[in-house]
Amino acid sequence: MNDLISAAYSERLRRVCDHIERHLDEPLSIEALSRMAHSSPFHFHRQFTTWSGLPLYRYIQWLRLRRASWRLAFNPQDKVIDIALDAGFQNPESFTRAFKTAFGQSPRRFRQSPDWLAWHQRVPKLALQEQHVMDVKIVEFPPTRVAMLTHLGHPDKVNASAAKFIAWRRETGQSPIASSQTFGIAWHDPQTTPPAQFRFDICGSVRQPIAENDVGVVNSEIPGGRCAVVRHQGSLDSLPESVWYLFREWLPASGETPRDFPVFFQYLNFVHEVAEHELLTDIYLPLR
């Protein structure tokens, strides 16, 4: 298969994946999906499995279960039966069996105490999305007072710390999610840092200093200054690729020099509120 044919083939299958992610709440027939890929229904299953690493039905179910796991962890007001029905299951029993097979915990147990380390280990490794040229801008970031919770430990457990921070915001009304900014400060690269030494700060903007608390949330500030910023759209799993684009492609050609402060992210929306393909995250690289 020459490069042009291979690229067109992959692009068709990526369009199928994009369609699936945007229509998880709807019936997804093999006939309709194979037509999108310009393929026969008899061969499409094998083509999709070879390209993505997962059978089509497992890919669709995994996306629905993954979305359900976010709702279980971060939307305590959502009932398990409603989450099960929204994930395409006809009853809670079949949802429970599928969820436990996928993530090693029942939905109720996951809601009470999610094992994020096991969750990440069970996530299927799919074909990487093609990296496109990204629009990098240089902006003046203002000094921003924040409430901050530091996660120190395995990067796959950051979601547990995020859940604590979200609960603190909801319970105290300080740094309200709807009207405040949300940031993450990436002190270390998870690919090169021993898990026990990995640090990631979870932050929400505040107007006034916060009170002392037992959660570990403290007052801090993200310093102002020049930053390169690029917007990442889609799953946070592919966020490292956008970060590496800044360092590998943009920075060497820009003539700029990084400042002595780590890359940080601003989360413009959240995975328990929107579909993954709708996630928007601004990546900031501080510059001198």
Swiss-Prot record:
Ranges of residues in domain HTH araC/xylS-type: 14-113
Taxonomy, superkingdom: Bacteria
Residue ranges flagged as DNA-binding region: 31-52, 80-103
GO terms classed as biological process: cellular response to antibiotic
A single GO molecular function term of this UniProt record: sequence-specific DNA binding
Keywords for the protein's UniProt record, in alphabetical order: DNA-binding, Transcription, Transcription regulation
Residues covered by region (Putative effector binding domain): 111-288
Domain-level remarks: Binds the peptide antibiotic albicidin with sub-micromolar affinity.
Assembly, per entry: Homodimer.
PANTHER family membership: TRANSCRIPTIONAL REGULATOR YGIV-RELATED
Other noteworthy facts: Duplication of the STM3175 gene increases tolerance of albicidin.
Function per UniProt: Probable transcription factor.
Entry protein name: Probable HTH-type transcriptional regulator STM3175
Native source species: Salmonella typhimurium (strain LT2 / SGSC1412 / ATCC 700720)
